[in-house]
């Protein structure tokens, strides 16, 4: 029986399914890491092995709590530290921590997760999404290095489905995972146009919604939940400070710095923005990702640095081609400080175009679209426009998508003709390795005619299938190095 650590899958749509499979002996959950807001739900209240990462933010461990890593293991995961560091930079609890202190924090979390894996003899870790944020980005390479199999569930691709893979490196290729289902032919039909209805850009997820009265009324529509959430945030904040004096001093300093950075960001945007662009010249359209986000911090690899991608793009283009860069509508000052704009201004023939300029007009007239892992490339190839990507993404093996490499020629990308039928066939093959169910509440909220019972049955069927597959096909290296 698989001895499993589950991270997430704690929402009401899926947690009862996971709990039931454990209780029936389908697999054994030794550790279940759940969100602090879910800890008192009935499915977790009486269950052993529940871990709340938020409770350990202050890192006040005792000597007997943590085991030391073997030397070979420390050496094996150390090359992954830049990715871990990039992900810790977005953790609010450790925000503005000096680099050297981040290294201490990472070492402590590494020992914590190593102890969980080794003492519980974990042989499988299940992640509900690509491992990101500081904590999961520590656990993932640690598990991989120890020969512990990882199963990653990724809500991506067509709405209402999720993909699965055994490693981040296989995401987009899906070469290592079995086919799960036979999609309906209608699922693989692609409208030959750019525009897509994206749930995360609609309703409560839209950029402007957070500042509206309606948004704030929704926030307090459940007073008990609202108060509990604010209380958790306040208590977590207090963990960061050793006394009231430190709390007041750092809060004042942080507030002042935030104000300055927001103001400076607006100044830089105003200074760089181009409101008039020529859609008839030769150019490549590069829509920026929202940052910080998993899609760049993890799936982007070294191209979490989006300016680096633009610099590489500039180097491969003919000198007279322009690059039109457009900011993400949800972007704030984070990862957009002064030197971001200084670097951008130093790249020849690059225009930072106004957010009001229509995305699809920019896409339609471009030679091709370039992005790290963005939906823009999927929109582009759907409408017949080729795309250049710099990271890993679910559609990366589809016709018309080019992964950046040093010898790639811009003219070859621009001249490639997408066969729409071949594109639909590629989507069909992708869908064979997806599940037509959901496990996230925010997706369910925007679904019409959602059937919770049917969804639960589909989830259970998939987990039974995948657990059986992993038991019948154990990792060759599982546990060997640990022994």
What role is predicted for each listed range?
Residues 112-176:
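Conserved nucleotide-sugar donor-interacting segment of glycosyltransferase catalytic cores
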Residues 278-306, 314, 327-330, 432-435, ...:
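Active-site donor-nucleotide binding/catalytic segment of nucleotide-sugar enzymes
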Residues 19-113, 119, 158-262, 476-480:
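Conserved N-terminal ligand/cofactor-binding loop architecture of enzyme catalytic domains
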Residues 311-354:
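Catalytic donor nucleotide-activated moiety binding site of glycosyltransferases and closely related
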Residues 128-131, 154, 354-402:
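A donor-sugar binding/catalytic signature common to diverse glycosyltransferases
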Residues 178-226, 400-483:
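Leloir-type glycosyltransferase catalytic cores
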Residues 29-36, 153, 322-328, 332:
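Short internal beta-strands
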């Amino acid at each position: 029986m698989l001895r499993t650590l589950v991270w997430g899958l704690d929402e009401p749509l899926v947690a009862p399914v996971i709990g039931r499979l454990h209780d029936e002996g389908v697999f054994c959950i030794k550790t279940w890491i759940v969100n602090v807001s879910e800890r008192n739900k009935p499915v977790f209240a009486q269950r052993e092995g529940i871990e709340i990462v938020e409770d350990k933010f202050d890192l006040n461990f005792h000597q007997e709590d943590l085991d030391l890593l073997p030397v070979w293991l420390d050496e094996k995961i150390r090359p992954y530290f830049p990715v871990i560091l990039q992900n810790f930079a977005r953790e609010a609890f450790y925000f503005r921590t000096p680099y050297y202190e981040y290294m201490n924090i990472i070492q402590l979390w590494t020992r914590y997760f190593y102890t969980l894996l080794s003492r519980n003899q974990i042989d499988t870790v299940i992640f509900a999404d690509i491992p990101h944020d500081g904590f999961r980005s520590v656990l993932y390479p640690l598990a991989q290095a120890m020969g512990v199999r990882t199963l990653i569930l990724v809500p991506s691709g067509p709405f209402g489905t999720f993909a699965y893979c055994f490693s981040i490196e296989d995401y987009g290729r899906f070469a290592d995972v079995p086919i799960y289902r036979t999609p309906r032919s209608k699922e693989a039909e692609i409208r030959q146009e750019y525009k897509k209805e994206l749930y995360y850009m609609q309703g409560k997820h839209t950029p402007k919604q957070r500042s509206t009265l309606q948004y704030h009324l929704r926030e307090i529509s459940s007073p008990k939940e609202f108060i509990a959430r604010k209380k958790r945030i306040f208590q977590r904040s207090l963990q960061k400070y050793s006394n009231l004096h430190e709390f007041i001093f750092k809060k004042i300093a942080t507030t002042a710095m935030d104000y300055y950075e927001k103001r400076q960001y607006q100044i830089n945007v105003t200074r760089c923005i181009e409101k008039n662009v020529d859609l008839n010249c030769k150019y490549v359209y590069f829509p920026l990702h929202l940052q910080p986000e998993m899609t760049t911090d993890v799936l982007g690899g070294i191209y979490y640095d989006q300016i680096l991608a633009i610099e590489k793009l500039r180097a491969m283009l003919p000198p007279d081609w322009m690059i039109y860069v457009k900011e993400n509508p949800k972007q704030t000052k984070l990862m957009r400080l002064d030197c971001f704009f200084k670097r951008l201004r130093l790249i020849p023939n690059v225009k930072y175009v106004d957010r009001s300029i229509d995305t699809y007009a920019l896409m339609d007239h471009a030679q091709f679209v370039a992005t790290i892992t963005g939906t823009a490339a999927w929109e582009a190839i759907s409408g017949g426009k080729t795309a250049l990507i710099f990271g890993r993404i679910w559609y990366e093996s589809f016709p018309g998508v080019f992964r950046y490499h040093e010898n790639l020629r811009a003219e070859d990308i621009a001249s490639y003709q997408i066969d729409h039928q071949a594109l639909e066939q590629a989507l069909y093959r992708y869908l064979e390795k997806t599940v037509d169910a959901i496990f996230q509440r925010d997706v369910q909220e925007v679904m019409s005619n959602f059937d919770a019972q049917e969804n639960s049955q589909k989830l259970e069927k998939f987990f039974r299938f995948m657990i059986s597959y992993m038991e019948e096909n154990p990792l060759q290296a599982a546990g060997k190095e640990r022994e």
